[in-house]
Amino acid sequence: CNERGETFVVHAERTPTLLICGAGPDAEPVCTFAAALGWRVTLVDHRPAYVDAARFPGAERVVRIDAESLANDIQLSEFDAAIVMSHHLVADGHYLAALADSNVGYVGLLGPAARRERLFAELGARADRLRSRLRAPVGLDLGGRSPEAIALSIIAEVQAVLHDRAGAPF
């Protein structure tokens, strides 16, 4: 309240949180774009050689975990979105299984639709819990094949979903 008894309300948006499962070279521009938007980014990978915080200066955390222990090692409820992009079928299956049992609202999977269907078959009943939240192939069709173009399409889709937008022109 001010001296006239007026109350002002300031709307403050919560900072989006992004989990990237897979710290390969193509995750670098995804992390960079997310950090440029002010998002809090955590990267995880099961491969020790990929877990190098120096490659991801925009990330809050870069963590080596076993893919099958994602839900035990990372508090998934703190994330608004997750992108699975390790390029390792078995690891991606473990990441998706943990995310299926979570409340993460947006889950993206890098790769073609055939890969998604193969992983869904392996997930069994868990696939049903994930189907409505999963975007696979991840990203908007913006054109371009470079890691940066793909990262832009991914982050654009996450931004649209988090803000309940279609990602269509104004």
Predicted regions and their residues:
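Fold-independent oxyanion-binding glycine-rich loops
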Residues: A23, H46, A67, S86-H88, ...
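ADP-ribose/adenylate-binding Rossmann-like module
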Residues: V44-D45, A81, S86-H87, G93, ...
